[in-house]
Amino acid sequence: MRADVVTIFPAYLEPLRLSLVGRAQERGTLEVRTHDLRAWTSDVHRTVDDAPYGGGPGMVMRPEPWDAALSEIAASDPARRPRVVVPTPAGRPFSQRHAEELAQEPWLVFCCGRYEGIDARVIETWADDEISIGDYVLAGGEVATLVILEAVARLLPGVLGNSASAADDSFSDGLLEAPAYTRPQVWRGVEVPAVLRSGDHAAVARWRRAQALRRTVARRPDLVAQAELSDADRAVLDAVAAEVQQAATPGGQRRPPWHRDSRA
């Protein structure tokens, strides 16, 4: 995969040289090219922004540098057309499914906006995707690009040492991931669940699935409605619902039995 990133702060993308994304580049699985948008300006001040029409605070990124940059990048490989991604709080929410979709693309171009955003005409002309990584506002699109690229890169063939790691991740099956444990067996008086030490792979799988369901119900109940559930899953959910009904606190509020009491 090739990924081009256009930004006015190229140094912001240095973390792409590290960890999984860095190793993917070393292996040739991923090629990342970072571009300074100011290279496509034509004035002595290398201006990339201007006041917004209609008034209001802040500045808007001008269309000319963006159009010149994207035109030149796209022309660098005439045989292919890149998928252009604009990180923005106004975009559709990013998810694991979206990462899987982008991981199938041979070429991505990320446009990192700043100030009050990029002139809407650039978005209308060039953007294939407008993506939001959450309901909050950042100073620019660079952090969102780092998030999206890492989520995508780890899905590329050979990037993870164990391909099962991606398959077992949170959201890969629509649920949050089950809790994980390692040595020592007992830490601060808390022992690793016996089933994980049993050597019974089927029992371990059942335990992890049940814990994933419990965790998802407690933290992201919206995901349960979208997940593909088996009869065994529904039995776990029925049991969880029954436990919650029996776990009323003195104030009348109901607390899930897996909720850790902060006073303990």
Curated annotation (Swiss-Prot):
What is the recorded function of this protein according to its Swiss-Prot or TrEMBL entry? Answer: Specifically methylates guanosine-37 in various tRNAs.
Query: EC number(s) on record?
Result: 2.1.1.228
Question: Mind telling me what this protein is named?
Answer: tRNA (guanine-N(1)-)-methyltransferase
Species of origin: Frankia alni (strain DSM 45986 / CECT 9034 / ACN14a)
Report the top EC class in one word.
transferase
In alphabetical order, the GO MF annotations are: tRNA (guanine(37)-N1)-methyltransferase activity
Gene3D superfamilies to which the protein is assigned, alphabetical: 3.40.1280.10, tRNA(m1g37)methyltransferase, domain 2 (1.10.1270.20)
Provide one Gene Ontology cellular component: cytosol
PANTHER family from the xrefs? Answer: TRNA (GUANINE-N(1)-)-METHYLTRANSFERASE (PTHR46417:SF1)
One Pfam entry name? tRNA_m1G_MT
Task: Tell me which Gene Ontology terms the entry assigns under biological process.
Answer: tRNA N1-guanine methylation
Gene coding for it:
trmD
